[in-house]
Amino acid sequence: MVAFSSLFLGASIAATALAAPGELPGMHLNKRQTYTQSATGTHDGYYFSFWTDGGPNVRYTNEAGGQYSVTWSGNGNWVGGKGWNPGAARTINYTGTYQPNGNSYLAVYGWTRNPLVEYYVVENFGTYDPSTGAQRLGSINVDGSTYNVYRTRRTNAPSIEGTRSFDQYWSVRVNKRVGGSVDMNAHFNAWRQAGLTLGTHDYQIVATEGYFSSGSARINVGGGSTGGGNNGGGNNGGNPGGNPGGNPGGNPGGNCSPRWGQCGGQGWNGPTCCESGTTCRQQNQWYSQCL
């Protein structure tokens, strides 16, 4: 996705500005389909987007209806999921399993144009909070939890319009979960009240992302009623991929952090050593990782 943010300088460096191919005309796949390279399209009634920088070992599979599954490991960044194009102020229902080991998140993810904005409603993440280092603009109580609202800025980064500078809007759920209803109209209104302006909607998916990590997920996406807000849209000419400028953290566990785990960074109170065969490497001022 361009998936975590300028917030996270490490991913900005690690994730290249590769754009996945645009959706091909008539690309309607009605059977189980597995990808290991970037792709976008329509599958069994849902839009899908899958992006990888080519580094990790990742297998993304479109399954029946709104369901997809993914397994991943290794060095690099990827992001994928199912949803809609265009996005809208809809209520999104989803269920599934999500088992990350290290840097990862689960979120409703999308873009708007005019202005160009990348946005996230983060439902779950690894052991590194994607809002680390960002300025909190407020909060919203919806869908059984508080979500804190943030804005970050990316400069000369990959986007659905090529290499551009743009804002990122974030709602980060305090009580992490896997499954439930996400009222996007409520989040859009909260962002508007915080002075964050959205444009014409491009795609909107329930995304899983991994960055120098491993794990697996199976997510089933559904839709609900559409609320207010800008439902205009258009098909993105290319998916910049999930380049999460975000560096979610690893799992410390034990006396030393395991491979992919966090081992340092401003505000880190966990282990600063790494398991045998790995080295603690600084990604940015907020995050160091065992690689």
Curated annotation (Swiss-Prot):
The name this protein carries in UniProt is: Endo-1,4-beta-xylanase 11B
Q: Where is the GH11 domain?
A: 34-222
Task: Report the glycosylation sites.
Answer: 93
Primary localization: secreted
- The organism encoding this protein is Humicola insolens
GO biological process annotation, one example:
xylan catabolic process
Q: In this protein, which residues make up the domain named CBM1?
A: 255-291
Family recorded in the similarity comment: Belongs to the glycosyl hydrolase 11 (cellulase G) family.
Q: Where in the cell is it found?
A: Secreted
Q: Does the keyword Glycoprotein apply?
A: yes
